[in-house]
């Protein structure tokens, strides 16, 4: 071998070519913008993505995809959700499970209608028919789905992208109609007048899941006094016994005795039909400073007194049940209304303890009204304006000018006690961002009461992760009312009913449902708008077509998505019903988890899932919700592709985005931002560089011919394989438990602490300096080959592209083209030997202490490389002494040397203290002395040895390197 001369003028030979330097095509930089799409194309061409899961022979695993809405760009919430699902699916595929992940999209509803309307000019809007709107909405949804699908694929998500489920598909809509019919025939679907959350801005009823409750809404808060006109005899007797004699005549009583109520919705007073009290609460009759008497809850006397600005003196006290049957005069109209007994919703936490009851404008009010057969009055139209039933207030908007006019009328009549602004949370339409009201309308409902107990029992049988999810959904199902499933929109699945043109008869039976189901299988829901009634009706009804008109309501979109179990997973032999797992954001306890539960329980008496896993929301680095107004939106597209300024917004690639998902405790809200991405990029770089180092040292190694028996390996290598086995086990457990942040921590620790900082640091001399075929090098290479294959395997569910890139850069022949074809890493029993752990952990602690001492010398510029040092160790710790003895007696003489492990030129155990030392340290381990190494520096291995200059052909080398050079030559 020719040893070239250096260029420094000293005429010294260079031994660089005699070293085993790194060689690999696995680049230091990921170049993810180019490389990741190449790897995705490789998966596609080789049928390695979701097709791998379909080909597996193991048991079926079904993670049922909750459908994102087909509108708008993908955001960090999408990334968190879909990547979590992909990690789980890929792990299951690697375990050999049969996996077919069917992605879905929620396609109906108002937001898409609004997007379509935005694109139309005035003339187009005027000419817009329901079917024209539906065609445009479907086209818009398909376009959005295509864009979102491309984004999901770029993230490395494996799914049956060519066969997704869409809630607008014919077969999906047909299955939904069938489900509706099954619920109807079990008696769970009914039509009735009932207060529902109504959005005047979108003119439709809303489900609870379609509401949001922003802070800072201001309502007019008023205290009002209604005049009492009649008392039951028993109440009069009770008051008389307490010394309170009241006028018997109506006029005299009404001038003297009032009942005080408090409300933040003055506009509901025209619909007042009663006041409700709690039969178990103590109520007082209190005298104000004008000698008027007020009925209020005893516990609220001081608060009411302060609010109305008048001292209130207790005159008499009665239980709430005594007030049942009292009559009062309506404050705005000439009518008499009763006191009634309400439920536990009446408390003494606020107000007066007496509730103004308008059955047409509240659920509790409605239920109480039904109990007492009160009129259900709702004098408000779909746009939020008073109708003629509101008398002089007709035409006023209940959310704008009605409150002011009503308050003025109360002032004029002398009924107003107090008015002031009240800031509180108030239900808003989540789409239009405008306030809603309670409004009684004719709607279609699913009677949750009919199967509530079954639903609660089903909740108990599901595994909820985190466990708090169980309590959350259980309380929601316990407390919820019947589910209003009708909407007054055109873009949706119709409620398949017919109404008689004369009278109030509704046509809904098995024959009509079966016929409409068959039509929808063939034509989709558009048939409801495109076909005449004669064709929508079964043949035996077609002659009566002129007597019927079809319904105009569509189904709540939560009924759409909540039907996915019947439309998707229960219809495929490749999927499980109930699904093994549902995984969505924590807001879905009131959304998809619940709607799916209710429909499945109603029809099949069990939940559609065995396990439910929830995640939090993606926030900015300061814990704030992302919004355009705050300018804090983190765009996943920019994370992958970079911004305009690549220095400020680098192109990190999909794997860094995926690494972020694995790094967070997703059970709570999770932060993301530039600083976090920068830190994650550093972690990713360390993992990548570790893999590159492993690959770079395998360029001339083939385990088929260079492999060794595990039992013949040095102690250091045996320990490293045992540690690798432990890490594979721990990562496996983390994936089984969906604890991906533990995977992240384990991966980081393994690559940085176990490999880079310890094993590979020690291995540099073995790998670079040894002769290519030396045992000390081949044994290390064998271990590196075993590790790199396992490393690629365990990171593949998360760092999918990087794992594949590693696999394709392994220089020796593998049986599998893809890391995913190897399946989940297996660890032979021969790797496992925990007897090495204690002594090596002790020596690692010693190494840490020595490194600190060496660093102290470097800081004082007394040392450069650690190989310039010699170390004397005088252990006082018996455990350490035993570990050093174990190494000396059992270690391989070419590898397991303490000076190699400490990366110094000489180590002395015990003996007399050295005369000349750079540093002395004494701690629990014992005494550590650092001295300058004697001898000269070998120009090849950089060790300091006493024999430098003794070899004529290589005067600058130590004896070990001379031997290696001569063997290479």
Swiss-Prot record:
Its main location: cytoplasm. The keyword Cell inner membrane does not apply. It catalyses: tRNA(Ile) + L-isoleucine + ATP = L-isoleucyl-tRNA(Ile) + AMP + diphosphate. InterPro entries: aa-tRNA-synth_I_CS (IPR001412), aa-tRNA-synth_Ia (IPR002300), Anticodon_Ile_BEm (IPR033708), Ile-tRNA-ligase (IPR002301), Ile-tRNA-ligase_type1 (IPR023585), Ile-tRNA_ligase (IPR050081), M/V/L/I-tRNA-synth_anticd-bd (IPR013155), Rossmann-like_a/b/a_fold (IPR014729). IleRS has two distinct active sites: one for aminoacylation and one for editing. The misactivated valine is translocated from the active site to the editing site, which sterically excludes the correctly activated isoleucine. The single editing site contains two valyl binding pockets, one specific for each substrate (Val-AMP or Val-tRNA(Ile)). Monomer. Belongs to the class-I aminoacyl-tRNA synthetase family. IleS type 1 subfamily. This is Isoleucine--tRNA ligase. It comes from Prochlorococcus marinus (strain SARG / CCMP1375 / SS120).
